[in-house]
Amino acid sequence: GVGDFASNLFWQSISMFLMFFYTDVFGLGAAVAGSILFVARVVDAVWDLFLGYAIDRTRTRWGRCRPYLLFAPPLLALAAWATFTVPNLSPDGKVLYAYATYIALMLCYSLVNIPYSAMPALLSANPVERTRLAEYRMFLAFSGGLLVAAATLPLVEWLGGGDRKLGYQSTVLAMGVLSVLLFWTCFAGTQERVAPLPQRPDLKGELRIILRSRTWW
């Protein structure tokens, strides 16, 4: 469940504050900021297909999904910190920087959360235990979102000392460090006990199914 708490430190920060940060702190126009969010989600949707394929083929002594909780969270924290950093660049340079960092943030978020979300099925085959895991996850996800909502603006003011650029950068850095520690706690405190069914992932077949789906379009 602490993984959901850690995930929501990022997700709720993006949902609640990123658009405001882009327009009022970073200095982007609303249309440009909106296009960045849209393009990043499209790129992430394609990335998720290949990431799922890679996870299916992952075989390590730590399991299939747990290794991602070890190496990916620092990348996610770094991408979040970069996203909420205002570079000293020209207006066009800042737009390119915003595109690059937010796309990187979305890719790293998926790199952590897709394998994390798949873990309950590998931790236990008992439906009662899985239900309990879901309850813990929901509670801690809500708690993480509540912390972001309550603490972000006071932390921005306190850590920035009136400088909102520094305040957002420092606040996201602090949340990133906390999230890495929580994901590593999740890695250390879990063990994949359920062997996945042997199957050969067919990426081409899955892409054909998706492209033919009316829901996708």
Residue ranges and their predicted role:
Residues G1-W217:
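Membrane-embedded alpha-helical bundles of multi-pass transporters/translocases
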